[in-house]
């Protein structure tokens, strides 16, 4: 017997959206772009210049 979805995910479906419900992949991309983006408060952005090719030897 396979577990039902509500048994596998008792807290609900979460932020996931079925492609058919989102109106296809284009609608899903628009939904993703419209959502607010957040970064963890203690994320330390210490990246050097990733695209700096002058330091390649």
Swiss-Prot record:
Annotated protein name in UniProt: COP9 signalosome complex subunit 9
Similarity-based family: Belongs to the CSN9 family.
Lineage: superkingdom: Eukaryota
Subunit field text: Component of the CSN complex, composed of COPS1/GPS1, COPS2, COPS3, COPS4, COPS5, COPS6, COPS7 (COPS7A or COPS7B), COPS8 and COPS9 isoform 1. In the complex, it interacts directly with COPS3, COPS5 and COPS6. Isoform 2 associates with CSN complex. Isoform 2 interacts with COPS5, CUL1, CUL3 and RPL11. According to PubMed:26456823, does not associate with CSN complex.
GO biological process: cellular response to UV; negative regulation of protein neddylation; positive regulation of cell population proliferation
Keywords for the protein's UniProt record, in alphabetical order: Cytoplasm, Nucleus, Phosphoprotein, Signalosome
Pfam family, one: MYEOV2
Chain positions found as Phosphothreonine: 26
Gene Ontology CC entries for this record: chromatin; COP9 signalosome; cytoplasm; nucleoplasm; nucleus
Transmembrane segment boundaries: none
């Amino acid at each position: 017997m396979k577990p039902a979805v509500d048994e596998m995910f008792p807290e609900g479906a979460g932020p996931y959206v079925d492609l058919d419900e989102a109106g296809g992949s284009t609608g899903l991309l628009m939904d993703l772009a419209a959502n607010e983006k957040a970064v963890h408060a203690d994320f330390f952005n210490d990246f050097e210049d990733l695209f700096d090719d002058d330091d390649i030897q």
